[in-house]
């Protein structure tokens, strides 16, 4: 038992070391935010927080931004800028809740798809359609690439595996354009760990899309990548939420 505990500890330490990235450096800075605000002059604290704010915006870390805006709001309590940071704080809290809701909807959708796959009941199919509608409503709340990616994932999957006779479109956007825009989002955020893993999901969706329309030359482009990662896709992605 003792040897197993030590082995597990070493494995955990190894995995944590592999997770080191520029993003984790920013989060470490954020973890020391009290040191920044209590141990430094106000002007230095504000400058430091604004630098962290810029880095968090670059990495699209909305939840962490709420912490920065909370402290900037406090530091500007005697300034007219307090209202500005209060607005930013409220906006990012609401946006974070929208992202959280979208992630839960996506997880619930795929759980519901499992029920539909085995039962093929009209009620289960209707529930999936209602979840797509709710996801669409959430995605419309913000001009957010992240919400766009979540909705696209759900919508394309639904039209390929639940309503295969329907044209694969995202609102007024054709599927080909949808895939292209998603790829641009991924390329614009190369250090985003979620997008790094979701790229495999969209390669799988592209493979299924081209197979569905019997465009086999295009399907070949994605087969090797998906086939090589098939075990990971089947074993681990369902555990996450996709």
Where are these regions (language model features)?
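Short charge-dense sequence patches
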Residues: 2-3, 18-22, 121-131, 169-176, ...
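Tandem amphipathic alpha-helical repeat scaffolds
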Residues: 32-38, 70-78, 108-122, 150-171, ...
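Conserved mid-sequence domains
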Residues: 172-183, 197-207, 216-224, 238-242
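Flexible inter-repeat linkers and adjacent short helices
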Residues: 1-149
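Amphipathic alpha-helical segments of tetratricopeptide repeats
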Residues: 50-57, 90-97, 132-141, 176-191, ...
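TPR-repeat structural position
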Residues: 42-43, 62, 82, 165-172, ...
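Alpha-solenoid helical repeat architecture
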Residues: 60-66, 101-108, 142-152, 188-203, ...
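Intrinsically disordered, low-complexity tails and linkers flanking structured cores
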Residues: 104, 122, 134, 143-144, ...
